[in-house]
């Protein structure tokens, strides 16, 4: 019997029961891959939750980014309040990787800011995987990066049991050995203190205090304590304290690793000297010998992860352990959400990491073994996966092929294209929405006079909005310039309109979408509006300009995703402006019409009247916006020549904006710009710190 307890006031409806039954049957029959092809707004998460509950295995849910991972985690926690639903994403608030730019001879040291709360959640996830089966871990793709070996992590943990005879001094030494720090004045995560016969520990995986009471060398009681009030929350008969860090290296293994690092260093120095690269040899020897001395003296050094191959005893090229290895082999389930985005990310992680590190190795900043501190290659990751469910409204061909789907081939413009044949393989379709809302009608109109035609459609929605439920409009263009010109044209005609483009920061993007939902404006114009956060039930019209211009933004899957933006509204309509009907357009329209007919037939058979979706605005987004920026990008550029004149009250917000720009630069591999922004942030923080110290 499954240990998962799903709690909901709703029952599966529409074709959710059929989808749940299909997925569960396929998984229990032992099939490795299956796909849930669910249209927008059909309740895919609810279906997956029921599937997890019926299969009853520990589950890893992978999302393409932190935002969607957080959203999924919250939804699953509501559905499984009595089970362990954990959150595992990168614990860096900011991460500037170590890099070298040969063209300018610029070395940029690693710089990062670790979020302590997220680190706690990561430890909580691995602890749950060791101690229970009813676990769902929601993770971003960063979970395929190296993590400490689960065997060493578990072996290093310390068990405590009431009545156990144990030497206090040995316990304190063991705690220090697994990276806990003694601090008798202030308890915090990863610390412990001793007062007489009482040992208090704040573990890495939660914020409650573990109090162990001794009578001599015998454990008399184990209690969990509220860290603020000191109130006893519960008493336990036994528990296990896990290491404060995921990377744990026993002393004997550390000494062997040091010998191996020294041997590799000598080999690489000989290689550089033979090539006449004396500068690189000197640089490598100086840096590595310093790191070796730190490892001998304190067991740690900056950039220790670059020696992870030696510290974990792996062979050259062998994949590192990651979160997947904390699941028991062949006894867990993988769910890949938005698989059309997530699967390509898994493929791309290794190559980007390798290119940067290879430059460091070639120029003597790192030993070649640093290349093995890396994310998994795609083939390595999939080799670890026993069973998987792909989830998407537009799954990629690779996912469909793995799920046994059949394809038909079509030759277009000299290219041979493959297209999925509906109803084949282990592809479970879910097209009926619980609300009864059907896919939108799709109209194709000529480009001549398209702007005037669009204006008329917008006026129609504005008029209807004044008479009943609000309606909004999304317009997608091919270029940023076209989006700007169209926005200006609509503004001149009294339309409340904004546009989105790639240069808008994440915070400002959220702010614009929030204003859109609240009715601060009625029309949103943009180029790539396929990203998350645009599933707005108020959108009743999606207009696609230049729909016949083939390319990524007008490919079949992109068009279906855009059509889906109007699929949550009872009056949903899509207008494609085009002079020719491309293959992508024809297939997207045909697929939408196919789903629409299924939905209409279901509504007729069950006498269902479509109901509009009423969504509450997210308080989390609003509170996020409350600390949003006041200064625009031009102000930021001008801020530093007159930094001393910036009011102290505005510095925290300015730092926040610079951190966003710094993260964006690091993500785009613009290391020099990121380093400059980092230095600017340091100056501002020093000014704030100086002010606080003087007061």
Curated annotation (Swiss-Prot):
One of its GO terms (cellular component) is cytoplasm. PROSITE patterns: HELICASE_ATP_BIND_1, HELICASE_CTER, UVR. Coiled coil: none annotated. One of its GO terms (molecular function) is DNA binding. It is found in: Cytoplasm. The keyword Nucleotide-binding applies. It comes from the Bacteria. A motif (Beta-hairpin) lies at residues 91-114. ATP binds at residues 38-45. Keywords: ATP-binding, Cytoplasm, DNA damage, DNA excision, DNA repair, Excision nuclease, Helicase, Hydrolase, Nucleotide-binding, SOS response. The beta-hairpin motif is involved in DNA binding. Forms a heterotetramer with UvrA during the search for lesions. Interacts with UvrC in an incision complex. PANTHER family: UVRABC SYSTEM PROTEIN B. This is UvrABC system protein B. It comes from Synechococcus sp. (strain JA-3-3Ab) (Cyanobacteria bacterium Yellowstone A-Prime). The lineage of its organism: Bacteria, Bacillati, Cyanobacteriota, Cyanophyceae, Synechococcales.
């Amino acid at each position: 019997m499954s240990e998962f307890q799903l709690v909901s006031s709703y029952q599966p409806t529409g074709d959710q029961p059929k989808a749940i039954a299909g997925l569960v049957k396929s998984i229990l029959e032992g099939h490795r891959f299956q796909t849930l092809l669910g249209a927008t707004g059909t309740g895919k998460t609810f279906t997956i939750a029921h599937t997890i509950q019926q299969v009853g295995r520990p589950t890893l849910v992978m999302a393409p980014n932190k935002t969607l991972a957080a959203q999924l985690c919250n939804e699953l926690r509501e559905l499984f309040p009595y089970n362990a639903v954990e959150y595992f994403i990168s614990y860096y608030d900011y991460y500037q990787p170590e890099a070298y730019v040969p063209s300018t001879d610029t070395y940029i040291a690693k710089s990062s800011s670790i979020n302590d709360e997220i680190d706690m959640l990561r430890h909580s996830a691995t602890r749950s995987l060791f101690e229970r089966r009813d676990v769902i871990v929601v993770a971003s793709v960063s979970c395929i990066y190296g993590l400490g070996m689960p065997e060493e992590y578990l072996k290093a943990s310390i068990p405590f049991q009431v009545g156990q005879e144990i030497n206090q001094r040995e316990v304190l030494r063991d705690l220090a050995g697994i990276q806990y720090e003694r601090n008798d004045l202030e308890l915090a995560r990863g610390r412990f203190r001793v007062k007489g016969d009482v040992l208090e520990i704040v573990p890495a995986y939660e914020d409650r205090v573990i109090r162990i009471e001794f009578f001599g060398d015998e454990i008399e009681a184990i209690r969990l304590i509220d860290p603020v009030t000191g109130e006893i929350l519960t008493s336990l008969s036994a528990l296990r304290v896990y290491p404060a860090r995921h990377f744990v290296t026993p002393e004997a293994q550390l000494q062997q690793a040091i010998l191996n690092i020294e041997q590799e260093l000598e080999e690489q120095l000989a290689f550089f000297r033979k090539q006449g690269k004396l500068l690189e040899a000197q640089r490598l020897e100086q840096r590595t010998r310093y790191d070796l001395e730190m490892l001998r003296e304190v067991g740690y050094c900056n950039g220790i992860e670059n020696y992870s191959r030696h510290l974990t005893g792996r062979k050259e090229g062998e994949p590192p352990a990651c979160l997947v290895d904390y699941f028991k082999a062949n006894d867990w389930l993988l769910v890949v959400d938005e698989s059309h985005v997530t699967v390509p990310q898994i493929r791309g992680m290794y190559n980007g990491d390798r290119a940067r590190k290879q430059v460091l190795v070639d120029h003597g900043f790192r030993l070649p073994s640093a290349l093995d501190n890396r994310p998994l290659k795609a083939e390595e990751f999939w080799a670890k996966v026993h069973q998987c469910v792909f989830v998407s409204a537009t799954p990629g061909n690779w996912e469909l092929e793995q799920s046994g789907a059949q394809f038909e081939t079509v030759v277009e413009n000299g290219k041979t294209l493959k297209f999925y044949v509906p109803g084949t393989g282990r592809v479970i379709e879910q097209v009926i929405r619980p609300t009864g809302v059907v896919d939108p009608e799709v109209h194709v109109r000529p480009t001549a006079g398209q702007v005037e035609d669009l204006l008329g459609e917008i006026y129609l929605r504005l008029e209807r909005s004044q008479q009943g439920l609000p309606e909004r409009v999304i317009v997608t263009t091919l270029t940023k310039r076209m989006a700007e010109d169209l926005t200006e044209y609509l503004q001149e005609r009294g339309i409340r309109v904004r546009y989105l483009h790639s240069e808008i920061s994440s915070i400002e993007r959220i702010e614009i979408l929030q204003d859109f939902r609240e009715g601060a404006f009625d029309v949103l114009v943009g180029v790539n509006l396929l990203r998350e956060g645009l599933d707005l039930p108020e959108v009743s019209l999606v207009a696609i300009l230049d729909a016949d211009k083939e390319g990524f933004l007008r490919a079949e899957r992109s068009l279906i995703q855009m059509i889906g933006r109007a699929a949550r509204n009872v009056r949903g309509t899509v207008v494609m402006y085009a002079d020719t009907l491309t293959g992508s357009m024809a297939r997207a329209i045909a697929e939408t019409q196919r789903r629409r007919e299924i939905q209409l037939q279901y509504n007729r058979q069950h006498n269902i009247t479509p109901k509009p979706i009423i969504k509450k605005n997210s308080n989390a987004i609003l509170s996020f916006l409350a600390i949003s920026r006041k200064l625009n990008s031009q102000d930021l550029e001008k801020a530093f020549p007159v930094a001393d004149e910036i009011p102290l009250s505005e510095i925290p917000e300015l730092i926040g904006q610079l951190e966003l720009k710094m993260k964006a630069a690091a993500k785009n591999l613009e290391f020099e710009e990121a380093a400059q922004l980092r230095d600017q942030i340091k100056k501002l923080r020093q000014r704030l710190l100086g002010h606080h110290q003087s007061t």
